[in-house]
Amino acid sequence: MNSTWSKLELSKSKNISQHNDYSFGYFIPNKLQRVMILIGKKTILKRGLFRSKYAKLIMSLSKGPLDIIFRKCSFRLWNESNLIEYGLLLDPNYNNEDIDFLIHGAKKNSNFVDIGSNVGLYSQPLALASPNGRVISIDANPLMKLRLDFNKKSSNISNIKTINLAVSDTSGKGSLIIRKNDIAIVALDENTSGDINFSTLIEILETNNIDEIYGLKIDIEGHEDKALVPFLLNAPKKLLPKKIVIEKPIKNQDYAGCVKAFKKLNYNLVGRSKNNSFYALNVHEKT
């Protein structure tokens, strides 16, 4: 494992229980923060390395977290290293292309799966787009489940099911590792004993009575082949996602196992964003 990875110590994360006693809106940005956020959204400060440093500066100007709205959804940001929260705070178009790809063509009762859901960047907009469907939001980090539970409640969203599990090709227990001390870059370590439960995607979906998926997003820091490939190759045809957004390991290249499975099942690469690839199932060909 790369030397920038280390064991995730959950005890070092901020105690969110005390802040969650305050309803959403209690921690709205102050006047100075609002001005700085507006400047950031309109300048280069919303990009790359500028964004993380500028976001940290903004959040340091008040005590406690920040409550913001993104795509009509409520998010409480925790001033803890989390690149997703930096994007939510400063970039009004953050991951919009990726989210819109999944939503386009969905019905009011379409189901979605979000593997590596973090604070709900994808899960919440997907749930709003299909209010009569279900969103299965899976994250191995128990803190992310708590934070997404708070966010969805604040957004008055009732069709998200949050699941605190890691996804792999088998079931067991492991630990979590973190890269660059960023809570958004966390992966499962199956070889180190710990309290993190992992299971297969097919088992998770069966437990939650999901028999059809319109869109699936997966971002689990290198575990994509183990989590997704066995599911795709063994799931009934009806359960195959119509659309998939998957994190790229490097520019213009996808995980080898997933690429083979996509080809076998007639998924077409239809686009790429900065961080992800977009695949659509060709339903007109035999699978």
Task: For the regions a language model picked out, list residue spans one by one.
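S-adenosyl-L-methionine
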Residues: 1-141, 146-151, 155, 206-208, ...
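Conserved beta-strand signature within the Rossmann-like core of class I S-adenosyl-L-methionine
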Residues: 240-248
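Short internal loop-to-helix segment that lines adenine-nucleotide cofactor pockets
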Residues: 90-113, 157, 161, 173-175, ...
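Active-site flanking residues adjacent to catalytic metal/cofactor-binding acidic residues
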Residues: 113-115, 138, 165, 216-218, ...
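Short, conserved loop/helix-junction motifs that constitute active-site signature segments
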Residues: 126-130, 233-241
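Conserved acidic residues
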Residues: 166-169, 200
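Canonical radical SAM enzyme core domain
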Residues: 141-147, 224, 248-252
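General small-molecule cofactor/ligand-binding pocket signal
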Residues: 161-163, 270
